[in-house]
């Protein structure tokens, strides 16, 4: 940027079309958050009506994560081939239909399947909306674009909590899911009123369609075996999270099978840059493992261990969700100021100071608990607002939507494991201690993975010929791409 440009307030660097693109994507993400968290709010009611165990009830939250990897791959490829806008609209319709189906579910199995549909739509919305906004905004503002966008999910969760306190006590839990069909109206408006992302238009102007991840996996020479592996992964995940398997060795074996399949898909689709993709999946996996036990089971903790009524639960969740939303925006400013990775690490370190007090204070003072949750979620959960920017920077425009969608949503299986892991630990400890212990310990893993830039570092160790030394979104250097003690010019930026 020139000196004269730097003196202009950041928001004036954006034109009306860019603000309209952001507003549309943000509203879509708000609706996504609204639909997705409904199950967490009514989990105890659903558990009581269907006669479920705590682990079975938690698996309904996990179900949406089980299908996310395929939704991210499929709808991400749609975004790479046909444009970010179409993928975003299709995703909204998909998760809205799944939410409506939850309202009509007669039992556990039907609701589990509906949650699978929601997961596919959510995955597509995440990848398509994130790439759409990031590619529509100027490079020096793309951490803000990412953070501001992801705040919509937390705002949607806050809105859902308030609607829950008004609707469920009067009309029951099913009525809450019927409201979730409304985003379809918004999707139809989006289809006609928003422009395509600038980066995507420039990349594809007058050119032949790109070869997407779907083309590579399901139309290439290994398509038969890849289709079989897709069904195998789906079946393995089903048995792990819905099959009520009691044998830990079998569950571990099925999990290992899924890991091998996902790594195989990453190797095929990313070529020599597969080490980067695999490490990004690990980053996201641990990011979900530290954050989603609280996200998924906080309402249950408030209702069961603290004995809060629905109105008080909604008030506490307001502080939590609003803190995460504010944190996404703060993370955007920090990311553009400090750099994406440094901002992430600093925010997570600060959040660690608050996680133990949140669950040690008990339920006697609602306002103090609410304030602690606000700041803990602002620092710990809110910084995830710049995660799409962090991941997207490792992929070129041609593969960004599918790369971000698949990588993020395979890693998001940590969100499927997290509530079940929290529920299992809570069988030996109280739920609050289980949630605090998981979050506190696993946050340090994420700090190390991001702080040391392990995706670039492992790429340099295993396949240095395909190393990317600079972020593809904002052109800033990757610290892990340069060995310690080397000069800044040790590597040349690659165009993979």
Curated annotation (Swiss-Prot):
Q: Which SUPFAM superfamilies match?
A: MFS general substrate transporter
Q: Which GO terms describe its molecular function?
A: carboxylic acid transmembrane transporter activity; sialic acid:proton symporter activity
CDD domains reported for this sequence: MFS_SV2_like
Where does this protein chiefly localize? membrane
Q: Which Pfam families match?
A: MFS_1
Enzymatic reactions: N-acetylneuraminate(in) + H(+)(in) = N-acetylneuraminate(out) + H(+)(out)
* Spans traversing the lipid bilayer: 22-42, 58-78, 86-106, 116-136, 148-168, 170-190, 224-244, 247-267, 278-298, 313-333, 353-373, 374-394, 406-426, 431-451
Topology within the bilayer? Multi-pass membrane protein
Q: Extract the InterPro entries matched here.
A: MFS, MFS_dom, MFS_trans_sf, SA_transporter
Q: Where in the cell is it found?
A: Cell inner membrane
Recite the UniProt keywords alphabetically. Answer: Cell inner membrane, Cell membrane, Membrane, Sugar transport, Transmembrane, Transmembrane helix, Transport
- Entry GO CC: plasma membrane
Q: What does this protein do?
A: Catalyzes the proton-dependent transport of sialic acid.
Q: Matching HAMAP family, A to Z?
A: MFS_NanT
- Protein family: Belongs to the major facilitator superfamily. Sialate:H(+) symporter (SHS) (TC 2.A.1.12) family.
**Name of the molecule in the record:** Sialic acid transporter NanT
């Amino acid at each position: 940027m020139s000196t004269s440009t730097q003196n202009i307030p950041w928001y004036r660097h954006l034109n009306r079309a860019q603000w309209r693109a952001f507003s549309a994507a943000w509203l879509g993400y708000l609706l996504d958050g609204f639909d997705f968290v409904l199950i967490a709010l009514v989990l105890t009611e659903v558990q009581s009506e269907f006669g479920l165990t705590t682990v079975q009830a938690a698996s309904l939250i996990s179900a949406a994560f089980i299908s996310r990897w395929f939704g991210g791959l499929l709808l991400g490829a749609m975004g790479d081939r046909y444009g970010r806008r179409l993928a975003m609209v299709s995703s909204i319709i998909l998760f809205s239909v799944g939410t409506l189906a939850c309202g009509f579910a007669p039992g556990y199995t039907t609701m589990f399947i509906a949650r699978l549909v929601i997961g596919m739509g959510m995955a597509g919305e995440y990848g398509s909306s994130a790439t759409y906004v990031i590619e529509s905004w100027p490079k020096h503002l793309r951490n803000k674009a990412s953070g501001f966008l992801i705040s919509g999910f937390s705002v949607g969760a806050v809105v859902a909590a308030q609607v829950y306190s008004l609707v469920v006590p009067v009309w029951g839990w099913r009525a809450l899911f019927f409201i979730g069909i409304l985003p379809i109206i918004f999707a139809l408006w989006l289809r006609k009123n928003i422009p395509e992302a600038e980066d995507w238009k420039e990349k594809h102007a007058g050119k032949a369609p790109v070869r997407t991840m779907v083309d590579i996996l399901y139309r290439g020479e290994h398509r038969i075996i890849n289709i079989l592996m897709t069904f195998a992964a789906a079946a393995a995940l089903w048995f792990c999270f819905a099959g009520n398997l009691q044998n830990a060795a079998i569950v571990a074996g099925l999990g290992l099978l899924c890991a091998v399949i996902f790594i195989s898909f990453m190797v095929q689709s990313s070529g020599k840059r597969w080490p980067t993709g695999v490490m990004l999946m690990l980053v996201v996996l641990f990011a979900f493992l530290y954050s989603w036990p609280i996200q998924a089971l906080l309402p249950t903790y408030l209702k069961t261990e603290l004995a809060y009524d629905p109105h008080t639960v909604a008030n506490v969740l307001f502080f939590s969700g609003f803190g995460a939303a504010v944190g996404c925006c703060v993370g955007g400013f920090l990311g553009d100021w400090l750099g994406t990775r440094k901002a992430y690490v600093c925010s997570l370190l600060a959040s660690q100071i608050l996680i133990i007090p949140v669950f040690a204070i008990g339920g006697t003072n609602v306002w103090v608990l609410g304030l602690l949750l606000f700041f803990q979620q602002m620092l710990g959960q809110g910084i995830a607002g710049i995660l799409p920017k962090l991941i997207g920077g490792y992929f070129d425009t041609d593969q960004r939507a599918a790369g971000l969608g698949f990588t993020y949503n395979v890693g998001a299986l940590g969100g499927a494991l997290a509530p079940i892991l929290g529920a299992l630990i809570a069988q030996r400890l109280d739920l609050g201690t289980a949630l605090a212990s998981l979050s506190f310990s696993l946050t340090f893993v994420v700090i190390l993975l991001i702080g040391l830039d392990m995706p670039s570092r492992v790429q340099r160790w295993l396949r240095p010929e395909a190393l990317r030394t600079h972020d593809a979104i904002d052109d800033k250097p990757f610290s892990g791409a340069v060995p310690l003690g080397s000069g800044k010019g040790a590597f040349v930026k690659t165009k993979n």
